[in-house]
UniProtKB/Swiss-Prot annotation:
PTM-bearing positions, type Arginine amide: 9
Keyword entries, A-Z: Amidation, Neuropeptide, Secreted
Protein name: Tachykinin-related peptide 1
Tissue distribution of the protein: Expressed in the antennal lobe (at protein level).
Origin: domain of life: Eukaryota
Organism, as annotated: Acrosternum hilare
Length: 9
């Protein structure tokens, strides 16, 4: 996903 929340995955 985007580097906002699920971006860490």
């Amino acid at each position: 996903g985007p580097s906002g929340f699920l971006g860490m995955r």
